[in-house]
Structures are given as structure tokens and as C-alpha cells.
Amino acid sequence: TDEGSVDKLGNFSFFSSDSHTKYPPTLETVWYDSKWDTGSLDPLTSANLEDMVIYMKGLRPEYKENSKAKFRVVGKERFPSTTYSTTPADLTIKYLPSGSSFYSIKDAETNDVIVPFSTSSLISCDSSGNYFNLDLEGYQPERYYSLEFRIQSGSNTVDETDQYFDEGFTFKVSI
């Protein structure tokens, strides 16, 4: 839209959550806030991406309404190769592909998509591993939400593949 224009382009009506409708009104705002700094972490290689598992590190069952939370996402090889070292392979954190790892959030009861896979849901990385920050303001309290992940490998090539991970990760937003 052109903010400087005086042309009338239509009306916009928005109702409060007290309107007693079946579905609460929504207003969608998105922004790109992904950061990428791997530190000394190693990447999951393309061979690892074909057979990997995703798990959440420190996922709490409940988060307070209007809070801000950091969700840690870890990808690892399903069957790590045998190596002889002082650190077990299960404890070695590797990072997911940059710019092609996304999260999505759904209402666990209705399966309505709250946060779709998009550039505004890119997973970030720091020296401790992958993560995403979530502002829970506007989420309906006393509801459960589920997390799903999409990992793209071979982006913009003939071998591009999308893998979806819906491992049953849920959390509740409480009052």
C-alpha cells in the first residue's frame, strides 16, 4: 500500500476477542529475525540429513502467556558412525542447514496453522546449537500447541528434498 495516498481502498474491520464468535480474530504480523553464528559446531552433512532425527532440548510442557521463550532444536544422525573419542556421538551437537530449516506451530486440537513455514520461521543458530525465539503474546491461553519442522537439503539443485518432522512436540500456554 501507499501510506501517502489519500485514495480510499476499502474498509478494514477488526473485532475484539470479546465478540463471542466461534474463532477469535487474528491479525498476522511477521518479521525476519534469524541469526546465524555456528561458533565451532560442525554441520550435519547431506548424508546425515537423509536419515536424521529431530528433538527438542529443554522443551517445557507449559509457558506463561505473554512471555518470550527460546526453543532449542537439535538434529542428529539416527545411526551415528562408530568413532573412538572422549565425547559420545549422541552428545555432539551439529547444526541444521542454514537458510533452509523452518518451524511451524499448530493449534494441537484443531490443527489450525498459527505460524506457517516461511522465511519468518527460519531456525537460527548460535554456538550452542539451533534455536528459535517465540513471543507468546497473542497466543490463546489454556491451549496446547504443536511444533513441526521442515528441513530442506540441496536447495536450488536437482537433488532438492524437503523433510518434515512431526514428532509430537507440544506445549501449553497458561495464564
What are these regions (language model features)?
Residues 1-62, 74-81, 101-104, 109, ...:
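Secreted, disulfide-rich extracellular signaling modules
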Residues 66-68, 98, 129, 140-148:
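Extracellular Ig-like/FN3 beta-sandwich strand-entry sites
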Residues 1, 137-162:
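Internal, hydrophobic beta-strand segments that form the core of beta-sheet-rich folds
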Residues 113, 122-144:
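Aromatic sugar-binding surface patches on proteins
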Residues 110-111, 155:
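Residue-level signal for glycine
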Residues 21, 153-175:
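Short beta-strand elements
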Residues 62-67, 77-98:
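A short beta-turn/strand-edge loop motif at beta-sheet boundaries
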